[in-house]
Amino acid sequence: RYGTDAATHAPEWISRSAGSASDVRFEALLRRLDDRTPDPKIRLTRRRVVVDGRMMEEFTLVSHLEEEVGLVLEVAVTPDATPMQEVKSGARPAAAVERTLAGDAVELTAGAASMRLRAPGGEVTASGDDLVLTWHVTCPPRAAATVSWHVDLDDPSLVVRGTARQVDWALQARGGDPRLNRWLRQALDDLDALRLTLPGSPDEFFAAGAPWFFTLFGRDSLWAARLFLSVDPGMAASTLRVLGRLQ
């Protein structure tokens, strides 16, 4: 939410675009701050990036007004440490999350799992079950201003991990329909985001059982690796090594 005084307003979200399976942008208008002309001159871009163990959001205010713009930007975050089996069953969230606030950061713990949230340049406060991240933003005339927050997660009980290996899978579809190449790029990007490893081993496999399990299923992971042989035979080899060590 945003505002220039005690009252805050919700942005008017108008579009979404995905740069990858792990990177998405949302565009919004802030009409309460704009001038009276029909064409919007102030936009807010919200970019969300997810990598192994971290989620980051970046808010960029872009102004084409002739005067300086000042506003308060608020983001409400609701910590939730409910185990997946309870989410799957539809049970009410019951996992207690302990919070330790410290200026622009907060430490969150739930059993052995922990999270550290930071909002550089802002302030983190508690409001009921929510955390409210607040920034006082000043955007110069015809310029941009950016604030961000991120959360780092650590859970030693997880039986799978992400992978740090970068891949450059590329395929060119045959045919004249441009939608086919777009679909192919999306499919490869989704598969990239599905790569997992087991703790202490670099060998990768494709996650299966989404969304409730999202882990190693020998049959499903082998099928996926087999269908992917023409793109990256290394995925089949590493999947076999993973399964071999578990025999």
Regions inferred by a protein language model and the residue ranges of each:
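Acidic-aromatic substrate-binding/catalytic surfaces of carbohydrate-active enzymes
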Residues: 1-27
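Glycine-centered tight beta-turn/hairpin loop motif at sheet-sheet or coil-to-beta transitions
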Residues: 6-8, 39-43, 112
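Low-complexity, acidic Ser/Thr/Pro/Gly-rich terminal tails and inter-domain linkers that flank the onset
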Residues: 20-53
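Acidic/polar, glycine-enriched structural segments that form the non-catalytic walls/loops
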Residues: 43, 51-56, 63-216, 237, ...
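Alpha-helical support elements that line or immediately flank enzyme active sites
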Residues: 220-247
